[in-house]
Amino acid sequence: MSREQQLIDLLYKEVVPAEGCTEPVALAYCAAKTRDVLGHIPDRIDVFASGNMIKNVKSVTVPNSGGMIGIEASVAMGTIAGNAAKELMVISGVTKADLPKVQEYLQKDCIKVFNASKPIKLYIRIEAYYKQDKVIVEFKYTHTNITLIKKNDEIIYEVDDADNKSNLVDEIISKFSIKEIYKIASHLDTSKISDMLDKIVKDNSNISNEGLVHQYGIQTGRNIRSGIDNGFYGDDIRNRAAAAASAGSDARMGGSALPVMTAAGSGNIGLTLSLPLIEFAKSKGKSQEELYRALFFAIVSTVYIKSSIGRLSALCGPTCASAGIAGGLAMMLDLSEDKVEKSIINALAGIIGIMCDGANSSCSIKIANSVYAAFDAVNAAMLGNTVTPHDGIVGDDVEGTIKNIAILATGKGMNETDDAILGVMTGRLADICK
C-alpha cells in the first residue's frame, strides 16, 4: 500500500460522525453493546472508567436526554434506548417517548461508577448483571475500540493488547512526519476523499449555524458575532472563523443532537480544525480543491501531533488543532513548505499548555483562543517571524517541538496535574494530593 493510501485510509478511520461529546456517547455505545450481549436490560451495572473519561463526562449534556448530564445518564441512555450498531451515533434515535423509561431506570440507582485507576487514558469497562448472567465489555485507547466481550466464563471476543495497539491510528500515523504529510497533501487527488470532506463541510457547518442561531452554554460564538455586529470586534475573517468554530462547540457541549465529524477522537477538534478553514476559503474565494487539500493536511497533521500526546490528556485537545489550522491556512495561502512548518511551530509555542478541565461549556472559549492563535501564527510566519529554537518548549524544528510537547504531556508532572484537575472537579482534591 502506498504512503498516500495509508493516509487516506487513516482519514476514513479517523473522521467519523458523533452525536454530542464523544466520551458520553462512547459510554452509551459500550452500554448498548453490553445490553445486546446480555440479552436483557441489566439488573445492575458497574462502570469502570479512566479518570480522563470521568473528567470529560461530568459536565456535558447528553444529546436527546432532555438535559441530563453525567456517566449514569449516558449509560442509562445507551442501555435503555441505544442502538450499538450506530457506534458514536448510538443514541441518535432516542425520542422523548424513551425518556420516562430512562428516568425510571436511573431512579433504581442500579448504575455504580468507579475510577478504573488504569494507566490508559481512555478506558471503559462495563460489567452488567441479569439474574445469574454477567457480561463484560471493555474499550481501550479509542472511543470505539472494543478489546473484550465476555459473557459468564465465555470469552466472545478478545484482542491481544500488543496486536491491538499496533493497528490503531496513533501507531500508524506516528511513522509519518509533518514534512511527508505536507508533501502528500500537496499532490493528493482530492476526488479520492471528496465524499468524506463534503460531509465534514456539511455537518460541521450545520452545527456551527445551530450554535450561532440558538442559545447554548456560554454562547461564545454568538458573543463574538454580537461583538462584530456592535463594533467591539472588527468584521474580519479571524473573528468570523473564531465565532464559527466556537459556536459549533457551544451547541455540541450544550446537548445539540446534530452530528459532528470528529478528528483525533474528538468532535471539538473536528470543529476547531474544519470551520476556520471553511470560513477562510469562503472569504478568500478559494477553490474546493484548495480547501480540501488544506482540510486533509490540517486533519492528518493534527492526528499526527495528537498521537504523541494521547487521545485524552491534561492538555486541551483543540490547542493541538490550532497547529492544524495554521498549517491549513498556510497551505491555502500557498506559502512555502518552510513557512508552513514555521506557522505550526508558532501556533504550538503560543497556545500549548492550556489545561483540559473536562468537556464543558468553557471548551468554546478555548476553541476561540486556539483559532486566534492559528491566525496570529500564520501572520507572523508570513512576515518572517518565528519563535526561536529552544525558546521554551520549541525545538530545533517542527518535529523537535512536537517531541518536546509529547514529553510535557505524557510526563509524571502532567499526570499529577490530571489527577489534581479531576480532584477539583469531583471535590476530592484533598484526598488526591495527600
From Swiss-Prot:
It holds the Pfam family SDH_alpha. GO terms for biological process: L-cysteine catabolic process to pyruvate. GO terms for molecular function: L-cysteine desulfhydrase activity. InterPro entries: Ser_deHydtase-like_asu, UPF0597. It comes from the Bacteria. Belongs to the UPF0597 family. This is UPF0597 protein Fphi_1065.
